[in-house]
Regions:
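A short glycine-rich, Lys/Arg-flanked "PGG" loop and its adjoining helix->strand segment in the class I
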Residues: 180-201
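Conserved SAM-binding loop of SAM-dependent methyltransferases across substrates and taxa
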Residues: 107-118
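Conserved SAM-binding strand-loop segment of SAM-dependent methyltransferases
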Residues: 140-151
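Conserved beta-strand signature within the Rossmann-like core of class I S-adenosyl-L-methionine
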Residues: 201-210
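Conserved class I S-adenosyl-L-methionine
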Residues: 97-106
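A short SAM/SAH-binding and catalytic strip from SAM-dependent methyltransferases
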Residues: 163-184
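Conserved alpha-helix/loop element of class I SAM-dependent methyltransferases that forms part
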Residues: 76-97
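A short acidic, Gly/Pro-enriched loop at the edge of an enzyme's catalytic core
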Residues: 154-163
Length: 254
């Protein structure tokens, strides 16, 4: 084997070993163990949804050629499974009843699963997708129609929450082509707004943020530093923050 080929081999091997023994890998393994020891049947949850009405919605709002991400949410089987994992990762399947606000609630699958475990949920999203309008009605998910803007407070909801979530967040992209995004100052404003106006004293904010268009992590060194300065616990694409900036939040909180 040539020296250059041997070098590339060891570089790839070292990267694989680094991933295998990283903190993220250990935490991921712990997530899988927790799900395995406390299983939740996504199939049973799916069976509680009116499949005939869901199919009617699919037929009424067929796939759109230029809306791949929205089209994907018509696969309720897949997304119920995904959101069961979200519920398990936050230990919501074994927690006492909580008040939950879901930012960018989309089709409403997450809040629907939460309700089956006794939690009270409210979604916040724009009203541009007719399919989402239909599914949230079908699932009985309450939502507030609003758009999240940088440096702008969210609308007053008249209450505070035990948990505020945002899964597959994309509201921080200012332009559709994802070339312009929120600044660290915009994120700091947003986090402060959530903490002071929407979280109860022991509340948590969970953000799962989509990777960048090139597949790299959302958390650039600058953004990671900003979130960590706010007391965030960062795990892969997720950031968990407590109501109190000085506290280190936990995914397990029952």
């Amino acid at each position: 084997m040539k020296r250059s080929s041997l070098h590339r081999f060891f570089v790839r091997l070292s990267r694989k070993l680094e991933k295998l023994f990283s903190i993220d890998a250990v935490q991921s393994l712990w997530e899988h163990i927790c799900r395995w020891t406390h299983p939740v049947s996504a199939r049973r949850i799916l069976a509680t949804i009116d499949q005939a009405e869901l199919e009617r919605l699919r037929q009424h709002y067929p796939y759109r050629p230029n809306a791949r991400r929205i089209n994907a949410y018509e696969d309720a089987t897949y997304w119920i499974g995904v959101n069961v994992k979200h519920v398990q990762d936050l230990w919501l399947d074994r927690a006492p009843p909580l008040d939950i606000l879901d930012l960018g609630c989309g089709a409403g699958y997450f809040l629907y699963v939460c309700r089956l475990f006794g939690h009270e949920g409210l979604g916040l999203d724009i009203d541009e997708e007719l399919f989402f309008r239909g599914t949230t009605r079908l699932l009985g998910v309450r939502r507030i129609i609003a758009r999240i803007h940088p440096q702008t407070p969210l609308p007053d909801l008249g209450k505070k929450f035990d948990l505020v979530t945002g899964h597959r967040v994309c509201f921080h992209w200012i332009t559709p082509d994802q070339r312009k995004e929120w600044t660290p100052a915009d994120w700091e404003f947003f986090i402060h707004d959530i903490r002071t106006r929407f979280l109860k004293p022991r509340g948590r904010l969970l953000l799962e943020i989509n990777p960048r268009p090139d597949g790299s992590s959302f958390f650039t060194p600058e953004l990671r530093a900003l979130f960590e300065s706010q007391g965030a616990r960062i795990f892969r694409r997720k950031a968990l923050l407590a109501a109190d900036r000085s506290e280190r939040p936990r995914f397990k909180q029952v």
